[in-house]
Design a protein with these regions (language model features):
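A surface-exposed, glycine/aromatic-enriched loop/edge motif typical of exported proteins
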Residues: 22-55, 145-214, 439-468, 509
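Short Gly/aromatic-enriched secondary-structure transition segments
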Residues: 27-31, 283-285, 346-349
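Extracellular/periplasmic, surface-exposed regions of secreted and cell-surface proteins
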Residues: 85, 128-137, 141-146, 196-281, ...
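Transmembrane beta-barrel wall of Gram-negative outer-membrane proteins
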Residues: 75-152, 170, 178-182, 240-241, ...
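A short glycine/small-residue-enriched secondary-structure motif
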Residues: 104-106, 284-295
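Residues embedded in well-ordered regular secondary structure
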Residues: 4-116, 184, 191, 195-214, ...
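Intrinsic-disorder/low-complexity loop/linker signature
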Residues: 26, 60-63, 70, 165-166, ...
Length: 525
């Protein structure tokens, strides 16, 4: 919202910062491999149970140790030093009849987690201008931003993986619970056949990521944070534009009359945004102890793209005028809003060459797509009138059309009206104004429309899911309408009646309101 000053030469300002984000270990003092091996050995000795595979007792030292001297510091593997920076350049100035302000901003943050993020980058540009003449004043404001974000998939993707793996834990829990005797990643454990458990001794998945399931302490399990953060990847790019423009016209002054009591204003609002999401979910084989989460033949790769866009345009013309004790405000407006969604998802199962993670490498491939459009067009007119702040009247009418409703009846008209009377403004007001300083009686009636349903619900949809018919003993697959639809979907209307009294006593120290209202709804969706 910053603007330049008139008669100001070009002024350039810069501010910025650079910083680092660090996740301290703090109170999380976990055991190293030697300490953990000794702990496991003593626990097994005390409970008279055999040592897990890989742990041995050194008869000379009397201490337990792990066979390959692995000593993984999971905090060091999972967390890294993040970097953030922000830079802003501002240019402003103005002449005798105009001002301008231009702001350029850059923000970048590299996250503290290894793997898919989160990382965030944003560019923003803002331009504000104003220009005034003797009769007209113009103002414009434009904002454009572009952002790019890498992070793990959304919760639904996590739940999907959890359904296959059984135990997908959050990052911190996995960092605390993973054994120091398991490597974060070991490419030598790659397995290209179905003998996953035999080849990696249950400690790694088929592609080298360490996994953990503990039978000694009961059913305790943890997910390798690097595994999870690389399984679920999402990139989101957003482009957004917002623009406003306005013109204030001094009508009487334009025609030579020296009056400030009549103003005409036009305002336009524009906005557009587009979001592109790219998803990647890879589910490799994982056999852990007696748990078989996924066999090699069921490894799954899912790739998806999602494009969302929305656009808005609003035009508003306002007249505001005063003649004596009469004050009139008239508004005429139009708005159009459109939303578009385009989803495309493909997945493949059974990968013979898993290091080539493309869908065409799968033995079986599947895909689905979905797109929809929602649009609403509105016209509005409103008039507010008051006489001496004593008699008040407001009347509004809207006409809205929605793409969600049946084509022939998708338009609806919604009127509203309200009246008010300031009894305390009358000469015959019987109460002491120092005691009752405001006494208002009001009544109103209004209608609102609701079209909050799904898209294309007024259209029958053909489905091929298990649609078969027997022709002379031969089962034939076909398509059929699978659901019933309402071909007469129209606006749901909510009607409101209201009567009220407002009182203010003792110079507004005490206020009182009494109301009666009635709400009814028609043509429920």
């Amino acid at each position: 919202t910053k603007r330049g000053q008139k008669d100001q030469p070009l002024k350039v300002d810069y501010n910025g910062y650079f910083g680092m984000d660090y996740i301290p270990k703090g109170v999380y003092d976990v055991m190293d491999a030697d300490q953990y091996s000794q702990y496991i050995g003593q626990a097994c000795a005390n409970s008279n149970t055999p040592l897990p595979s890989g742990y041995k007792l050194n008869s000379e030292t009397g201490k337990y140790h792990f066979q390959d001297d692995t000593n993984t510091n999971w905090f060091d593997e999972v967390f890294k030093t993040g970097i953030r920076q922000n830079h802003n350049v501002n240019l402003s100035g103005g002449g005798a009849h105009n001002t301008y302000n231009i702001a350029l901003d850059y923000f970048n943050q590299k996250g503290t987690l290894e793997g898919a993020g989160p990382n965030y980058e944003r560019y923003t540009a803002r331009v504000n201008n104003s220009m005034d003449t003797k009769f007209i004043k113009f103002q414009t404001s434009l904002v454009y931003s572009h952002s790019d974000q890498d992070n793990m998939g959304l919760s639904n993707a996590s739940e999907y993986v959890q359904g296959l793996y059984g135990d997908v834990t959050n990052i911190l829990r996995g960092t605390l619970l993973m054994q120091p005797t398991i490597k974060a990643y070991d490419s030598s454990t790659w397995v290209l056949d179905n003998l996953v458990g035999i080849a990696n001794n249950f400690n790694y998945d088929a592609y080298g990521y360490g996994v953990y399931y503990d039978t000694i302490h009961g059913d305790i399990s943890a997910s390798n944070p690097l595994l999870v953060n690389n399984l679920l990847q999402r990139n989101t790019r957003v482009d957004r534009f917002v623009g406003t423009g306005s013109a204030d016209v001094d009508i009487f002054n334009m025609f030579g009359f020296n009056s400030k009591n009549h103003k005409l204003n036009y305002k336009i609002n524009l906005s557009y945004s587009k979001t592109f999401c790219k998803d990647f979910t890879w589910i490799p084989a994982w056999v852990q102890s007696n748990r078989v989460y996924l066999s090699k033949s069921n490894e799954r790769l899912t790739k998806g793209s999602r494009i969302y866009s929305d656009a808005l345009i609003e035009n508003v013309l306002t007249y505001d005028g005063t003649i004596g004790k009469h004050h009139i405000n008239v508004v005429a407006g139009q708005s159009y809003e459109e939303e578009n969604t385009d989803l495309l998802t493909g997945w493949g199962i059974n990968f013979t060459e898993p290091y080539f993670l493309q869908l065409q490498n799968a033995a079986n491939t599947y895909s689905e797509s979905y797109e929809y459009k929602h649009a609403i067009l509105s016209y509005i007119g409103r008039i507010n009138y008051n006489y001496d702040d004593r008699y008040l009247l407001s009347a509004t009418v809207r006409r809205d059309g929605s793409s969600r409703l049946t084509r022939s009846i998708r338009w609806g008209t919604f009127p509203s009206v309200s009246v008010g009377w300031r009894f305390d403004k009358e000469n015959f007001f019987p109460f002491n104004p120092d005691v009752v300083n405001m006494f208002k009686v009001r009544a109103s009636y209004g209608e609102l429309g609701n079209e909050n349903i799904g898209e294309y619900m007024y259209q029958a949809v053909m489905s091929r899911n298990n649609m078969t018919y027997n022709f002379n003993g031969n089962v034939v697959t076909g398509s059929a309408v699978s659901t019933f639809v309402d071909n007469n979907l129209a606006w749901e209307k909510k009607k409101t009646y209201n009567v009220g009294i407002d009182l203010a006593l003792f110079r507004n120290r005490l206020e009182f309101t009494a109301e009666w209202y009635k709400n009814t709804s028609e043509d429920l969706l």
